Amino acid sequence: MTTRATHATQGDHEMAATLPPGILIEQPTPTSTVFDRYLSAEGRRIGAAIAELRPTIRAQAAQAEQQGRLSDELIAEFTRIGLYRVTGPVEYGGLALGARDVAEIARELGRGDASAGWTFLVASSLRMVSTFPKELVEDLYRAVDTWQGPLAAGGSTFAAVTGTARRVPRGWMVKGKWSFASGNHHANWIFGGVQWTDGDDSGHGLVMMEPSDLTRLDDWSVSGMSASDSNTMVATEEFFVPDAHFVNMRDLPLHIDSASSRYGGLAYQAKVRGSMMTVMVLNVAILIGMAQGCFELFVEQANSRKPFSPPYPLVAEMASTQVAAGKARAMIDAAETVVLRYADWIDQVATEGGDFTAADESVASIDMSYVGQLCLDAMDLMLRILGSSAVSLSNPIQRFGRDGRVILSHGALRLEPLSEIAGRHLLGLPPFDMFAAGLQNKA
């Protein structure tokens, strides 16, 4: 048995002496125990295309923040490479990729810019809405070959405050306010939640609305994720939505569970909780990519900047910087390991025709929320080491930290509420009636 793993040879020391300090290690720590068996050729292709676009994504990030949305040019590029088809059914021109593909694509986008990752989150809603009744789906995909951007965006779909809908012949009269409609400028349809009434019956539903029926408020002024295009959409006067564009949330589990009999592709083999867990995977994979992108810039800047104190020629030569680099890398790799493990598990359960329990989902949600926070902690550590130069708006590294804080404020990602929800399961207490990382069950 060789001792090379534990004892460095003179050759090792000679080789190390020839390496420049602070070189960025591109090869990630191994994170998969299944050898990436759920990664598809199409998923790899899209990931590689995004990597090629990364310089453009980063170059446009500051302007996108000022405009409140990604540029038309970038949206067109994402459309060209097939980003907005990733979770659509093959039968309607989509790719129907599984959770591992989704995770890798989201991570690659996050390395460039968080809001670019968020536009993919918007597009991934096709996984759910494609399971709705056929007439709605036919209308949704009518422009799939010509539309530039995501086919659908959504606002306040599961929120406590939504729109209203009252029954009329052949449809519904709808009005209301739908907040956080991410991607609304580039979407062909807008989905929104409604409290509906039909005589003595009432409940929660979703409606597919034409953007022309809505007014967009210029209210997306935030400290991070400014380019996510998350304006509020309103309709102060009632407008008509046909029956075909209305979905009763009571039927949501039945719709999602029917997907495997309607469509091919791994995305549609996942059942209700597996589908919802995939959204959580996507969310946190964006954060992992952001932390990896932040690390790239951290290494670059640490090797090109002089510290305020102590008197080293470069920030990278400070012991505290070296410790921070090691800790940050370990935090990011640990987060990636957890999320990819869940992605692979979701795909495995989907191929076996099973689903997860409520307890499985709640624990998975808190695990992924926790490692999402770990990514933010790693980014904060790197920013702190770089000092005041890292908070200048002209320095792109600061955007990762700001965007990370806003993402983790999302209701489906907040650590403490998710901990309480999971804790009730773990302690054997009666669980809350919730699903999808803490959303109220509105069925």
Regions found by a protein language model. Give the residues of each.
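Amphipathic, small/basic residue-rich leader segments at the start of a protein or domain
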Residues: 1-124
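Generic structural signal for well-ordered, non-transmembrane alpha-helical segments
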Residues: 48-51, 289-292, 296, 326-333, ...
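C-terminal helix-coil-helix/basic helical segment that borders enzyme active sites and/or dimer interfaces
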Residues: 58, 62-65, 333-370, 383-391
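Glycine-rich flavin
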Residues: 72-80, 85-188, 202
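DPxDG-like acidic metal-binding loop motif
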Residues: 177-220, 229
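Glycine-rich beta->alpha junctions and the first turn(s) of the following alpha-helix
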Residues: 224, 232-332
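Extended, amphipathic, non-transmembrane alpha-helical segments
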Residues: 300-302, 335-341, 377
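Glycine-rich phosphate/cofactor-binding loops in nucleotide/flavin-utilizing enzymes
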Residues: 386-443
